[in-house]
């Protein structure tokens, strides 16, 4: 039985920074998209279903971007999973390539948006494609968290994070088990940081778009680049448990290995 080595504290901290940056990215691009691209939710993709329902109820014509955003998101997720499967077959770690793909998609969205002028036609092809590139970038971000950062909270949808955060606070307050309380505290910290990052991103995105319009997409694009640079510099390959938990897990695994060898010798 192979025993995994404990992750370094530096790598774990770098990963937390990447996750916070991704949360700010999602919050900012969602606010900018909603305010500047005709009510398009780029990160919180299911919000577009509410927008569509509202238009249908009012017997209004729904924007094309809102109509196609959900199918585009699903296709982008599927393509990302196929790409990840191909990288896995080549024994390539997934986090950094997926962060690069996200950055490139956001860059494409930024280029199309600013190329359309200060007041782009939201029904024009370039504006719609720009929005869908943003949606695809958030699909990649959602996928990389699920595939490569499995122990991490969502960086795009905060409802689950808020639920987890409050439940973990309840677990800490109940104090039924010291070990469970420590784990709940660690989960609450990660969920809380993701929530805070998203809220900060929403505020920054809303503020920037009010001043510089669609040039504000430089913010999420730049944050995605910083996250990629950190991941490359720290050689991050995916999620890792907090070092103290990893050491406990490693110790348990080593004990199990010794026990297995003992029984094999009987």
Annotate each predicted stretch with a short phrase.
Residues 2-252, 262-266:
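Alpha-helical transmembrane segments of multi-pass membrane proteins
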């Amino acid at each position: 039985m192979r025993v995994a080595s404990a992750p370094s504290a530096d790598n774990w901290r770098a990963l937390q920074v990447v996750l916070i940056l991704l949360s700010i990215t999602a919050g900012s691009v969602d606010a900018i998209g909603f305010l500047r691209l005709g009510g398009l939710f780029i990160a919180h993709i299911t919000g577009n279903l509410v927008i569509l329902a509202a238009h249908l109820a009012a017997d209004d014509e729904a924007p094309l971007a809102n109509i196609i955003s959900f199918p585009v998101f699903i296709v982008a997720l599927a393509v990302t999973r196929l790409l990840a499967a191909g990288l896995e077959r080549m024994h390539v770690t997934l986090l950094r390539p997926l962060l690069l793909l996200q950055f490139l998609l956001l860059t494409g969205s930024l280029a199309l948006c600013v190329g359309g002028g200060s007041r782009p036609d939201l029904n024009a092809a370039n504006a719609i494609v720009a929005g869908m590139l943003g949606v695809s970038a958030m699909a990649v971000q959602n996928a990389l968290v699920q595939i490569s950062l499995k122990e991490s909270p969502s960086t795009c949808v905060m409802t689950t994070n808020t639920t987890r955060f409050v439940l973990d606070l309840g677990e800490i307050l109940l104090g039924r088990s010291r070990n469970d309380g420590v784990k709940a505290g660690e989960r609450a910290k990660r969920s809380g940081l993701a929530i805070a990052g998203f809220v900060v991103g929403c505020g920054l995105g809303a503020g920037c778009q009010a001043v510089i319009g669609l040039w504000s997409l430089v913010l999420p694009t730049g944050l995605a680049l910083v996250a990629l640079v950190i991941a490359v510099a720290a050689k991050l390959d995916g999620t890792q448990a907090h070092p103290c938990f990893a050491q406990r897990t490693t110790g348990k695994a080593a004990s199990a290995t010794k026990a297995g060898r003992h029984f094999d010798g009987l």
